[in-house]
Amino acid sequence: MTPVIALVGRPNVGKSTLFNQMTRSRDALVADFPGLTRDRKYGEGNYEGQKFIVIDTGGLTGDEAGIDAEMARQSMQAVEEADIVLFLVDGRAGLTAGDEMIADYLRKSGKQAHLVVNKTDGQDPDVAAADFYSLGFESTFLIAAAHNRGILSLLEALLPEPENPEDQDRADRYPGIRIGVVGRPNVGKSTLVNRMLGEDRVVVYDMPGTTRDSVYIPYERQGHEYTLIDTAGVRRRKNVREAVEKFSIIKTLQAIDDAHVVILVIDAREGLVDQDLHLIGFVLDAGRSLVIAINKWDGMDPEDRDRVKEQVARRLDFLDYADKYYISALHGTGVGTMYESVQACYESAMSKWPTNRLTAILQDAVAQHQPPMVHGRRIKLRYAHQGGSNPPVVVVHGNQVDSLPGAYKRYLENTFRKVLKVVGAPIRFEFKSGENPFATKVDRLTPRQKVKKDNDLKKGRRIKKTRQKSVKR
């Protein structure tokens, strides 16, 4: 299971800076969902192959009834979701009453909490941390998040050893195509999951799982095996009525990561909103195949339907490769037709292509539209081969590929997608420059070249002497 790390502490102690360092990017996989996860940001990190999720909170003042009680509630919710809690304090400001109250709350929570003294740069770290030892935490780490000091040691000490392959690949133990159904609260995820399962009269039963674990439900349909990854908490058929869901980013990230194909459910009556785009960003960053289901299509006026279709076409024009379905999960309209896209997405994501075919596509693309010139030299793309699947990765070798414009990369992606007939799945490209085979060789002249060089030098000396004599005269 992916470890979840929560960062808590007073405002402005460096939580967001540490968050950015742990996710290794200021625009890493980050979501900020107003109203649902206010003042909580979620990101993914990776340390030596060990993935983890980081939750950044807005800050605790130590007083739950303070100016922003909602901020305190969200921070406490992050603590409940986490496996590991990092309690950040400011080494420059020293120990405060707010720090003491937060420490007391963490002790009562029973969570695995560690003290992290930040902003220790420019002073003696031991002196900066001295006051905080009185808080009584078993482990204390000294870091300078702004300068990325001490963070790798922190991760090395806290993250568990990689799980054994049997546990690590638990998703692989489930048969067939794994389908993750994700979406905002109350868009109809539970209804859709039960409709998909109910089409073959599969009995849905309670399965064990914690508050942040997705539920894996294997089933068969028309001779094909599938596993639905449920983030909405589907239970017995008698409890199918859509209630207010508890939205969990943790479940969503887990479902996307484990899935072969992701079905994103959008509420047609509310239209496409920013939170939907955030979720699409999660799917694209994970490189998963995508099918979009616009739900609650029944009972809408023709004018409203046209408006929604226009909005989807305009705001999702960058997803022209993903199939879009207008469905009613409640009545089952259009649900069965999605399986055709699910199957096509899976086949595209798991495809294997020979090197000679990929190279031929590359050469044809270059012949039709050559790469631009850089410093008077044409960028050359020599050959291509496959570097992975789910998502499909195409590795292109050439020279000066670092200078290849984004527009040309998109041209290559569209060309490969069209020729290979890839549906629903993103194609990732990696560009590698070929090394110069003569770079490490000593420049040795042949005997003939040596004679020519000597003659040129002698000729140059004679010309120089002649010019000097002319100047003296």
Swiss-Prot record:
Binding sites annotated in the UniProt record for GTP 2: 183-190, 230-234, 295-298
Record-annotated KH-like domain positions: 351-435
SUPFAM superfamilies xrefs: P-loop containing nucleoside triphosphate hydrolases
An example Gene Ontology biological process: ribosome biogenesis
Any matching Pfam family: MMR_HSR1
Alphabetically ordered keywords of this record: GTP-binding, Nucleotide-binding, Repeat, Ribosome biogenesis
Region described as Disordered: 444-473
Residue ranges with Basic residues bias: 459-473
Residues involved in GTP 1 binding: 9-16, 56-60, 118-121
Ranges of compositional bias, category Basic and acidic residues: 444-458
PROSITE patterns referenced in this protein's UniProt entry, alphabetically: G_ENGA
GO MF term set: ATP hydrolysis activity; GTP binding; ribosome binding
Record domain EngA-type G: where: 3-166, 177-350
Annotated InterPro entries: AAA+_ATPase, G_ENGA, GTP-bd, GTPase_Der, KH_dom-like, KH_dom-like_a/b, P-loop_NTPase, Small_GTP-bd
Family: Belongs to the TRAFAC class TrmE-Era-EngA-EngB-Septin-like GTPase superfamily. EngA (Der) GTPase family.
Function as written in the Swiss-Prot or TrEMBL entry: GTPase that plays an essential role in the late steps of ribosome biogenesis.
Subunit structure, as described in the record: Associates with the 50S ribosomal subunit.
Protein name: GTPase Der
